[in-house]
Amino acid sequence: MFRTQSRYLVRSILANHCVLPSTRMAVSPILNQSIKFYSSKDNATDKSQEKEQPKSILNDDMLARAGFEDVDPKEETSNSEEQATKQTGRKRKRAQTSKDLQRERYANMFYLSALIFGVAGVGYMSRDWDSEKEQEEMDGKNVENGYTPKLMYERLSKRLGSLFTFFSEPAFENLLPPPPPEQYRRPLTLVVTLDDFLIHSNWDTQHGWRTGKRPGLDYFLGYLSQYYEIVVFSSNSQIYSDKTVNKLDPYHAYISYALFREACRYKDGKLIKDLSLLNRDLGKTVMIDVDEDSAALQPENSIIVKKWEGQPDEYLISLIPFLEYLATQPVKDVRPILNSYKDKSNIVAEFAERENKLREQWRKDHGGNNGKPNAGNFIAKLLGIPVPEPKMPLDIIREHGQLQYEHFQKYLQENAHKFLEEEQKLKDEFGKVTLNKLITEGAPNAEEIAKVQQQRALEEAQKQQEGHK
């Protein structure tokens, strides 16, 4: 600002120099003073800038507390000047302190101990098998004992792989309890998937998540429960699917057991449902699923069907004749029968064709009582009454199955409240188990539950006797 005013004053005086010489002489002292003032101001600022040098905010006390040794300020200034003059701009190496040396010593000790423990661990993991049981559990039947590099590496890989089986193997070796005695046992075991076969879940912005039952689901479960031990095996976690299974069978009358994702085997990025862990005879086990990967270990026991997308259909009802026929035949192994169908996904249509051929052959063999005269048929023809065809054994089985289903539904409706009350009593009885007792003694087993049920039955019988008196 001051410089601009002085320049303006000089220009105005020089412009009027030729016109007013007397004025020039009068103003020149003022000009000289202003110029001297300006030059003195600039000199003062330059000297102050030279005197003021940048100072570090880190003093000696702060550096000492941080663990850095004192550095001579003269050496520091000289080094900074040398760095400024050099074009390479190398960074000055910081002097190592006692704490730095201590850290390096501890790090070297840690690396050395880690190396020693690592070598010892590898040697221990590659040792000979402790027992035949361990060899079987590690799936190392083909790996013998010995200390050759190949055998040691194979045992090491088997043992290291077993450390991660917690995340890939099922929670238990036997997913189901032992089967009941023969007189109380159903002929076959039916393993069905839950999602996209029995139910379908859908999400939209208006309603959120909604889950729908497939048409004919209640009849499918109720009718086949008299022939099969039904096991629902879901690919989702128990926390998501457990409530859904309870909604499908609130009285626990149709579904014998429910398994979830925790019971699956994870291998090569696939969720596999291993039927060999069900504690059941594979020759009498049938699995229906919508994913081929789920049946990767036992494809001969499985029927892979198409996913249900939520549209109305009658597929569950159409599956009943084949499954009923399979359960009512005196077969020891269902796998040859299942593998006799070329396309298992279209097993309903192929079974219907076989049934029609069998029915035609039955009519030929038993039509008109093999050509023998029958008075009843003759009178019926005279009266115009249609002659009834002889029933196939399969028709008789279906009539008997339908009658049994109706009786069971009637019994279930009459005693539904009793079932719910008994279930609530069991929950109250075993709900008193504390966490300490659960950890120390474990969960109640089947025998304890049976004892409680027997005790409840005796109490109810005593109450009924007292009521009659």
From Swiss-Prot:
Sorted UniProt keywords: Membrane, Mitochondrion, Mitochondrion inner membrane, Protein transport, Transit peptide, Translocation, Transmembrane, Transmembrane helix, Transport
Protein name, per record: Mitochondrial import inner membrane translocase subunit TIM50
GO BP terms, alphabetized: protein import into mitochondrial matrix
Keyword Transport annotated: yes
Domain of life per record: Eukaryota
Mitochondrial intermembrane-side positions: 126-469
Membrane topology of this protein: Single-pass membrane protein
PANTHER family assigned to the protein according to its UniProt record, in alphabetical order: DULLARD PROTEIN PHOSPHATASE (PTHR12210)
Transit peptide (first-last residue): 1-16
TM region positions: 109-125
Annotated Gene Ontology cellular component terms: plasma membrane; TIM23 mitochondrial import inner membrane translocase complex
Function: Essential component of the TIM23 complex, a complex that mediates the translocation of transit peptide-containing proteins across the mitochondrial inner membrane. Required to direct preproteins in transit and direct them to the channel protein TIM23, and possibly facilitates transfer of the translocating proteins from the TOM complex to the TIM23 complex.
Subunit structure: Component of the TIM23 complex, at least composed of TIM23, TIM17, TIM50 and TIM21. Interacts with preproteins in transit.
Region ranges (Disordered): 70-99
Topological domain spans for side Mitochondrial matrix: 17-108
Family designation: Belongs to the TIM50 family.
Keyword Cell division on entry: no
Localization of this protein: Mitochondrion inner membrane
Residue stretches making up the FCP1 homology domain: 183-326
Gene symbol of the encoding locus: TIM50
